[in-house]
A protein has these predicted regions:
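Primarily recognizes the serine-hydrolase "nucleophile elbow" in alpha/beta-hydrolase
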Residues: 128, 134-189, 193
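The feature captures the conserved acid-bearing segment of alpha/beta-hydrolase catalytic domains
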Residues: 175-239
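Histidine-bearing beta->alpha loop at or near hydrolase active sites
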Residues: 243-249
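N-terminal cap/lid segment of alpha/beta-hydrolase-fold proteins
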Residues: 12-48
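Short beta-strand element of the alpha/beta-hydrolase
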Residues: 40-43, 50-62
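Single conserved hydrophobic/aromatic residue that forms the stacking wall/gate
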Residues: 1-11
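Catalytic active-site module of serine/aspartate enzymes centered on a nucleophile-bearing elbow/loop
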Residues: 256-265
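Cap/lid segment of the alpha/beta-hydrolase catalytic domain
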Residues: 61-131
Length: 265
């Protein structure tokens, strides 16, 4: 029988007596950040990892690679959606977007480095070991807040690598680089160069899903609405949704659950 919306949402992020996937912590020395780094791999239950699609999933400012599987319950949501027959199994890779770049004896936050780390280190390493992904059609990227900025920049610079895109409570414009209060590197204001990729007539053909969402009481809602105009001006085909709630996990959990049901079809 069909579940009511409220009951279904309750079940999606509750631990139940069903098969559960695994979480593995992978450590490596990054040549880009000059630091030891970690990413977390979720593998769904009862299926081999080889050949699975994979979603690279990023957290927000001030959080870490564990956030999506602790507060976010992303692994539990996927376990439940798989058991309910709502999605086909796919893997997750969650990396630390608060990249601490080691410069001499000091460390400083440089979130921009994540793009290179993903493309040059994390994706090759994870996909070689677990044999998932391996091609654009089996690879997606999504992120919330700061992670949405990292997602947009990465998919715009590398549309050949990803077929599914999720921008949660999200921004298509960079809002950290060049910000005097948040950019520890002290760069000049960023000129949104990555958005030029959206002027490509083939931009919409690169992605199966381009999902953008936010809460109706989010402190960044006005910025999101401003970016509606950019999306429309550039003719980007998107799925857009506004949820009840603020800039918090009460929005991001159902947002992730909905996005999971759109991708890798």
């Amino acid at each position: 029988c069909l579940l009511s919306r409220g009951l279904e949402m309750c079940i999606r992020d509750r631990i139940r007596d069903i098969p559960h996937g695994t979480l593995t912590h992978e450590f490596y020395k990054s040549e880009i950040s000059n630091n030891w780094e970690r990413f977390i791999v979720y593998l769904p239950p009862c299926v081999p990892s080889a050949g699975l699609p994979v979603l690279y999933l990023q957290h927000g400012f001030g959080e870490s690679e564990i956030s999506w599987t602790t507060t976010g319950k992303a692994n539990i949501i996927l376990d439940n959606l798989i058991e309910m027959g709502k999605i086909k199994p796919f893997a997750l890779v969650m990396s630390d977007g608060m990249v601490q770049e080691k410069v001499g004896s000091e460390e400083r936050l440089n979130h921009v480095l994540l793009e290179r780390m993903l493309v040059e280190e994390i994706i090759p390493m994870a996909e070689k070991k677990y044999q998932f992904g391996g091609c654009k059609e089996k690879r997606g990227m999504a992120g919330l807040s700061m992670g949405s900025v990292q997602t947009t920049r990465t998919i715009c610079d590398h549309p050949d690598l990803f077929s599914e895109v999720g921008i949660f409570s999200g921004f298509i414009r960079e809002n950290i680089e060049g910000n005097p209060d948040r950019d520890a590197v002290g760069r000049k204001p960023y000129e949104q160069i990555h958005l030029k990729a959206m002027d490509d007539p083939d931009f919409n053909n690169y992605f199966h899903t381009f999902f953008r969402c936010i809460g109706d009481n989010d402190c960044f809602l006005s910025r999101f609405l401003e970016e509606d105009a950019i999306i429309q001006e550039k003719g980007v085909h998107e799925i857009r949704k506004i949820y009840p709630g603020g800039h918090d996990w009460n929005v991001w959990r159902p947002c992730f659950a909905d996005f999971a049901q759109m991708i890798f079809r």
